[in-house]
């Protein structure tokens, strides 16, 4: 049986573990206690994690009784999550209107809402123009959706770098002066996250005797690789750009930089960030496939904490992690 003292000691070790002070940390220190964790931290915990999790678990458990399809379940989950996010954002902003955007918390709350609205707007535009009415255009539709997502996330990145104090300068200085420290640490966290994460996930589904298959998020992204023709290669290039370069930076700004600032307690931030990262990747509502994303989010959170709140480390670690996944996905298409 695990003693409570052992758990406390473990979390204290996580809290205190970090790289040595370097010039970038002294010039642009990250404030892990920007807000009050018992107030602002709880707003984030409940609006972005607890309420969405309760909702998606309830929908999955009672799906048969409620007589809802997988598509409708995903839609209900997305709409309810946006509602919880909006309420949380209003409460948080009413308490901290001056720092809401500069701290990055506004981006944390705004990201899922903006992504949905941006995708909806361009989806409606495509339907109005009638570009993808023909069934033969499914492959081009996938490319279009990937392009829309890429543009949306690039806009979030640009906005974040322009609003969050010193973020752009800190990242530039880290890459310029600390590459010898940054790259090995990022690779180490990526490798550990990938292999430990996949091992733990396999153990979980084996012990629980689950036959989950591929997550709907992963399935939706990978299925266009099976299409023949030029569209397959266009999609592949866009997929690599989004997955390895754009998405890791955007998601780390949201799930680490902004969330750690808002929660303002290192240990609680690691827990909340890991769960939130999982929720971000189950928009279809398949909660049983949340585990690998939560585990990955946990290691990226550790990278952020270990680097004293330096976005560059968890971002690069996330990129390397995704690169491993992309290489394996593409290799599986050609190696039988």
From Swiss-Prot:
Domain of life from the UniProt record: Bacteria
Gene Ontology MF term list: endopeptidase activity
Matches recorded under InterPro entries: CAAX_protease, Rce1/LyrA-like_dom
Pfam families: Rce1-like
Signal peptide: none
A Gene Ontology BP annotation from the UniProt entry: CAAX-box protein maturation
Protein name in UniProt: Uncharacterized protein MCAP_0715
Source organism of this protein record: Mycoplasma capricolum subsp. capricolum (strain California kid / ATCC 27343 / NCTC 10154)
Source organism phylogeny: Bacteria, Bacillati, Mycoplasmatota, Mollicutes, Mycoplasmataceae
């Amino acid at each position: 049986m695990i003693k409570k003292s052992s758990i406390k000691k473990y979390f204290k070790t996580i809290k205190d573990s970090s790289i040595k002070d370097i010039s970038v940390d002294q010039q642009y220190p990250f404030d892990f206690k920007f807000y009050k964790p018992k107030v602002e931290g709880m707003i984030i915990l409940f609006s972005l994690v607890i309420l969405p999790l309760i909702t998606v678990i309830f929908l999955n458990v009672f799906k048969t009784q409620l007589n809802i399809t997988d598509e409708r379940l995903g839609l209900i989950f997305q709409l309810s999550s946006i509602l919880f996010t909006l309420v949380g954002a209003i409460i948080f902003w009413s308490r901290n209107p001056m720092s809401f955007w500069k701290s990055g918390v506004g981006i944390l709350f705004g990201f899922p809402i903006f992504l949905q609205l941006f995708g909806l707007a361009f989806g409606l535009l495509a339907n109005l123009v009638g570009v993808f009415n023909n069934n033969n255009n499914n492959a081009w539709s996938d490319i279009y959706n990937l392009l829309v997502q890429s543009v949306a996330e690039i806009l979030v990145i640009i906005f974040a770098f322009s609003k969050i104090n010193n973020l752009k300068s800190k990242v530039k200085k880290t890459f310029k002066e600390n590459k010898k420290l940054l790259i090995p640490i990022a690779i180490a966290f990526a490798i550990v996250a990938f292999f430990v994460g996949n091992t733990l996930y396999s153990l979980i589904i084996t012990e629980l005797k689950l036959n989950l298959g591929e997550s709907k998020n992963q399935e939706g992204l990978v299925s266009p690789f099976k299409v023949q023709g030029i569209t397959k290669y266009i999609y592949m290039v866009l997929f690599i750009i989004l997955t390895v370069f754009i998405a890791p930076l955007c998601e780390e700004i949201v799930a680490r930089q902004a969330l750690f600032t808002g929660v303002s307690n290192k240990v609680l931030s690691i827990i909340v960030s890991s769960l939130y990262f999982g929720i971000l990747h189950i928009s279809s509502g398949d909660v049983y496939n949340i585990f690998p994303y939560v585990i990955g989010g946990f290691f990226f959170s550790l990278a952020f904490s270990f680097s004293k709140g330096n976005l560059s480390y968890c971002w690069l670690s996330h990129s390397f992690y995704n690169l491993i996944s992309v290489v394996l996905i593409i290799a599986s298409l050609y190696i039988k």
